[in-house]
């Protein structure tokens, strides 16, 4: 259960704790908070050197993004960047999942960018699990056949 008085401490742990397990758990916990203060730290955590922190941050951004159109757009912009540049397949798959959760809240231009990126991944990615996640996302958005 979220505790409003814990938000600042959790954000501090995410940003400064030396233990990657603590940062990962904190990124996961922050999904329970719908206030604006957690959005930016989670976005910054997408650049963390530990894949598990990036993975859980991307999941939490899907939750925080669903709170408002503004949050959805801010989270989605960074998730799309991470999808394009992250080397870890699990993180990239999770970015696709998170973007798919935010899809309905995004403007048409961004939706098109996401569909284009998923199509490229479904057709050309070197990692089969990421390709499959992109195909699943396209199917869920009603874009069956875009990758055949």
Stretches found by the model and what they are:
Residues 54, 120-126:
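Short, mixed-charge aromatic SLiMs
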Residues 1-3, 12, 21-35, 44, ...:
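Structural detector for internal amphipathic alpha-helices that build alpha-solenoid repeat scaffolds
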């Amino acid at each position: 259960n979220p505790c409003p008085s814990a938000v600042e401490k959790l954000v501090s742990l995410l940003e400064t704790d030396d233990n990657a397990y603590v940062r990962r758990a904190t990124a996961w916990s922050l999904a329970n908070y719908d206030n604006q203060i957690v959005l930016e730290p989670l976005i910054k955590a997408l650049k963390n050197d530990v894949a598990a922190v990036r993975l859980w941050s991307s999941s939490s951004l899907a939750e925080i993004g669903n709170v408002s159109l503004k949050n959805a757009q801010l989270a989605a912009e960074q998730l799309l960047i991470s999808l394009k540049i992250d080397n870890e397949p699990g993180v990239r798959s999770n970015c696709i999942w998170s973007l798919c959760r935010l899809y309905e809240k995004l403007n048409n231009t961004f939706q098109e960018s996401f569909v284009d990126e998923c199509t490229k991944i479904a057709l050309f990615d070197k990692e089969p699990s990421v390709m499959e996640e992109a195909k699943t996302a396209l199917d869920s958005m009603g874009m069956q056949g875009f990758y055949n």
